[in-house]
Each structure stands twice: as structure tokens, then as C-alpha cells.
Amino acid sequence: MGAGRDEVVRVGITPAGTMNLVRSHHRDVLRRLAPVLPPGPEPACSHPGLVWAATRTPTGGGDPAGVAELARSLADAGSMPSLKHLTPGAASDASDASGTSDTSDTSDTSDAPSVPEWCRWGTDQLLADIRRTSGAGDADFRAPDPREGIAHLEAARDTLRTVWPEAALESDLLVRVIVYVQGGAFRSATLRQTFGAVYLGTSSVESVPAAFEALLHETGHHALYLRNFFAPFVTNGDVMISHPLRPDPRPVSGAVHAAHVLARMAYGLTRWAAAQPAAPPEVTARRDDALHRLRGTIEALEPTAEWTEEGRRYFDDLLRWEKELTAAHRS
């Protein structure tokens, strides 16, 4: 895999390595979907609907015709189509063939198609986790007005392109759809089975720095899922431990994810603060919090995680990142 193999064990980002991993993963998704793909040009890029269908049994889930339609719609999309925004349950949803919508459309869409199956499945999984961890059996998601959140997210994307262009490219390559929901303390999530979709709660996009952090956070989860597709990092991923990113015990594999995204968040926020001295104070406050929680997560992993050979190389790089970020913070 050349540059991609090095990228697997790297906390950071190189454009060539990211492209290599993305292409290899996309080829695997198409291989698994081959029985239900229509004749003609293949999808030019991945999509959460395709990834979700590739994980179903039988392949394609319950709607192979929908998979075929989605595949055809992506044939000319290019490797980085425009980011789509989806608000499940909103009356203003105007879905296209990919099951996403332009939330700025205020026309009458009473006959719009329903929320795509992959998205319903994803929000159901998130609700089940919220109900289990909170004990609130009646917890539910509502459809927020996403316009302010979208504006904050787009401003955050512009900032990321300026202060960390490699991370902006990675996000453009990995994230296809933003799903906006509102419910309790839910902030944000990524699910491996709907790779390409980011689920955002209203609090995660309440300001531009919050949206910037959420973008780094959830793109970071995508990046680590992509790396682990090629190489697992731990052999005891199911062992439960506590770490500073979650209030309840989570598997070791989840703590590795926490450390990865916290390192990305701390680094991106550090670059923003350095590049723009007039950045809002919230930027440095979020950076300091991410760095503090990164140290706590590493301390939770060090005595517990059992690393593979690739995982050991990755963790060594993570330790180097944390050391350099801490030194920069103290200087």
C-alpha cells in the first residue's frame, strides 16, 4: 500500500496516504456490493448508504433497488462531492437520490422521500445507546432548525482549510453527510457501519469553535476506523476501562478512539490559536481541555491496552504527539 501503509500507523495526515487508504477502502465496499450494483460506471466515491448496505445480510439490505439508485447517482460525483446536510423528521427535508437534503430549501416538500434506511438505522443505534447509558427509556431525537449550525460548520470548515489544510482535505474525502439531531445531552457521533456520516447534536455546532472541534472529533473517528480497516491496533479491544471522554466505562478500542480524536482536536485548535491571535478565547479553552483529557486517556490506556505490532507503532506516535503538544502549550 506504499504511503497508505505508513498512514495506517500515523496519528497525523498526509494527502497521499489518506487518498491511498480511501481508494482501497472504497474498492472493498464496491467488491462487497458487486451482486447488487447496476451495470455501467461504478460510484466515484463512497457514501454511508453504500457502506451500510455492504455490511447488511444479505448484501444490499432490504432495498437493493435503492442501493442501485444511489450507486448510479454517485457515478459522476467525483472523489469529493459537496457535503450534504440531513435533518431526519424535518418537514423541510428535500431529499435527493443519496437520501440527503439541502436544508436551505424552504419550499413545500410534503411529498419528499422518507429518511434513508441507513440514517434511520444509525439514529436508532444512537438512541439505544443513550437510553442504555442514561436510563431514560423514553429519550428521543427531535428535528432541530439546523440553519445556524450549518453556518457555524461551514465557517469552521473554512477555518480548517486555512489553519490545517491536510485535515480539511481528509474531512472532504471521508465525510459525505452531516445528520443534525436534537436530544438531551447528545453531542456528536460516528458509526462504523454508516462510515461517511457524522451525527451532530445542536450543542456541537452552537459556535464556530464548537463546530471546528466537532469536525476534527468526528473526522478523527472516521480516520481511525479507516486505519483499523487495514490493521487492528489492540488485541483486547473489548476490555472495559474508564477514560475522560465518556462518563461510563467503555471498551479499550473506544479509548483508543478517544485518544486519537483528542490528539487531533488539541492539535487543530493549537494551530488555529497560533495562526489567528485574535481567535475567540473559546479556542484556547477547548484546546486546553482536549490536551488535559488526552493525557488522562493515555494514562488509562498505558497499563491496559495490549497492542499489535502496528498498534504499538501507532501508540508511540500518539505519545510523541502528546509530548510535543504539551511542550508547545507550556512554552
Could you tell me what each predicted segment is?
Residues M1-D129:
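N-terminal low-structure segments adjacent to metalloprotease catalytic domains
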Residues I130-T194, S204-V205:
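Auxiliary, metal-adjacent structural segments of Zn-dependent hydrolase domains
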Residues A151-A156, R192-L226, E322-S331:
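Long, acidic, intrinsically disordered low-complexity segments
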Residues L191, V205-A214, H222-S253:
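Post-HEXXH active-site segment of zinc metalloproteases
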Residues L191-Q193, V198, G254, A259-A266, ...:
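Extended, composition-driven regions rather than compact fold-specific motifs
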Residues V239-A278:
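Post-HExxH zinc-binding segment in Zn-dependent metallohydrolases
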Residues R250, Y267-A275, E282-I298:
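Long, charge-rich alpha-helical interaction segments
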Residues T284-S331:
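Pan-zinc metallopeptidase signature
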